[in-house]
């Protein structure tokens, strides 16, 4: 059967977990289905990497060009100013401003007409306005990545003044209305946690939902040896994210000093794109190693014995935790950090909210090789059983097949 899948950004270079999710999903779905894929570009970009990668999966690649593509710098700046004005003057989100244009719609319709898909699937909800124009026989799917309900619940934790917070609430509530409107038009909503499934069914039990964790091809991680330093820990994630920055600051300011007081030789690896040096430099010494973005994180992660993730707020699935666990690295973090992957407390790591308790559990693993070995084995087994491509997107593929079969009959 034919699937047309759209991602409202550039798939490559892969820098975040949303891109990882899309790439891995495409890899598994392409085994069972004929796929046409589009991502979106706002300026001249080399598509050779994306085209080459997807051709290896026998995926037809049709990039979509946003307004201003191939235009000069002045035009792009003017267009950007117009988008900013729409964003600030109205409740429409910046993401919608980018994709809700006649040019984008025209390109999508052209691809739909040429490929005649059985399934039309979008990542995020922004392109849901297209659904009402599609032939009713085409199944409509949304992979949410996150829900607006999650963001609304966190609004008071944002670093905003009263006016900014009020404006943000208006935009989020507008987006929530749009999100739910598009969900009602769908044949299937794909979420990455059971918590998201519950949030959707709390307002409408009739919305068809499937939970598909962030599956990955974990073979290279599972086979990679753990060469951990007996006293090394790590913080791993995209550090351009405000919630990860807060968690890192908490670790450096309140947790790592406790750990070092108990085990002075402990090293901390900070791994991830856009490390906030304004925060790190306040605490930097020889025990803190900052890698920044690395193309292959396995050699760095595998030096560590524990991953520490003291997130207080945040949304979405913790795909970086899965990579660490596949390398046999136990995780100590808050419930906010670990609930989406359904970590079993005491088996693959520990869930604690208090700084002293987090530090205590980290030191317990560092000082107890028998416990570390047991948890390390548990982590690899847990990652393989729950987050492989087959156990996640393989199940999604079966569900899509079943839906198409029902429509055909």
Predicted regions and their residues:
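A short, well-ordered alpha-helix in the C-terminal region of glycosyltransferases
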Residues: 364, 371-386, 392-398
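Acceptor-binding helix/loop patch of EC 2.4 sugar-transfer enzymes
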Residues: 69-98, 141-177, 238
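Conserved catalytic-core segment of nucleotide-activated headgroup transferases in glycan assembly
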Residues: 21, 211-286, 290-295, 302
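Short hydrophobic beta-strand element within catalytic cores of glycosyltransferases
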Residues: 320-324, 330-334
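Conserved acidic donor-binding segment of nucleotide-sugar-dependent glycosyltransferases
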Residues: 346-356, 364-370
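Membrane-proximal helix-turn-helix segments that form the acceptor-binding/catalytic region
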Residues: 24, 103-110, 148, 163-189
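N-terminal subdomain of nucleotide-sugar transferases
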Residues: 1-65
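Acidic donor-binding loop of glycosyltransferase active sites
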Residues: 187, 287, 302-316, 327-330
